[in-house]
Amino acid sequence: EATGSDLVVGDIVSAVDYAKRVAKIQHDAVFLVGTSGGGYHCLVMAGRHPELFAGISAWASISDLRVWYHDNLRSGRRYWSDIVKSCGGKPGDSRAVDEEYRKRSPVHYLRNAKGRVRLQIATGITDGHSGSVPISHSLLAFNEVADSKDRIGLKEIAFMTREARLPDVFERAAPDPSFGDKQPVFHRSSATAAVTIFDGGHEIIPSAAIAWMEGLYAERK
């Protein structure tokens, strides 16, 4: 019932609807933010219900459960067993199991969010080394919502994921005071999405997420 299931999606939709009905909020200024599993569900909602949100901020996010299953087998982290429980088996066990991996993996439908919701994707450069989710998940998620000219090359993604540093051909991102002492290393924007890799690990920088949402809210006034 967890891990990007229809029940989880329905619960989030219901929570937004409840807030709109019982609280005095601006219906066109609802934001979603999360990190790790919360960031993963931010990407799920971006792909499945972009119309509900003015902006979505996803940090240290998983974008492909099949890939993350193998990531965890290699790293020795036991999250792979949770994935198996959620999806009903290991990748390749059956067509039904593989379909569960597909429909619970936002990388397969994030393109639905392009042009429909503002999306901030961010993670620390050492995630996957000191943390549990390789940065390739965030970079490949960005590629799904980016214009073709702005997509990040697969070789560059593999290098950054493996080496936890920028390729020599990339310039370091401009400073951003909202990130404090964990400054951006890489930043790229395209259409209604942006990705930032910062000098950190598997974490959210609350001040940066809040500043991003405040900026979007100011634009809407």
Could you tell me what each predicted segment is?
Residues 3-23:
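Alpha/beta-hydrolase active-site loop
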Residues 187-221:
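Catalytic active-site module of serine/aspartate enzymes centered on a nucleophile-bearing elbow/loop
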